[in-house]
């Protein structure tokens, strides 16, 4: 089953990390992705630019509303994702717990709905 790991981080805390600390996070994430790829479980993933680079689009009463930044003002913002294919939720949780940012941030595990919406 496919799962999306949504990696949310506190952007202010991320900005305070040293270059070495950030490289440690990136290196650990790359190592995990390489391991999952070798097992055929890694489908896609990438870090995202800061939320200040985001654009939100909404349609209200037939009108397009475009705003700079994320839709919600929260401390943690979506900072990256991993799409994995594993047998079950327990395996997805085990992988999410190995994402380096899980130690200081949040990794949301969400099953991917396949096929037409029901």
PLM feature spans:
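Conserved, structured core segments of small domains
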Residues: 1-118
């Amino acid at each position: 089953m496919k799962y999306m790991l949504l990696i949310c981080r506190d952007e202010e805390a991320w900005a305070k990390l040293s270059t070495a600390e950030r490289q440690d996070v990136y290196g650990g994430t790359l190592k995990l992705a390489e391991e999952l790829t070798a097992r055929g479980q890694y489908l896609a993933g990438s870090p995202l630019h800061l939320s200040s680079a985001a654009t939100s689009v909404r349609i209200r009463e037939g009108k397009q509303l475009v705003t700079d930044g994320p839709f919600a003002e929260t401390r943690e913002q979506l900072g990256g994702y991993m799409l994995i294919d594993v047998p079950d939720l327990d395996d997805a949780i085990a992988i999410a717990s190995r994402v380096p940012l899980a130690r200081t941030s949040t990794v949301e595990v969400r099953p991917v709905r396949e096929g037409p919406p029901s």
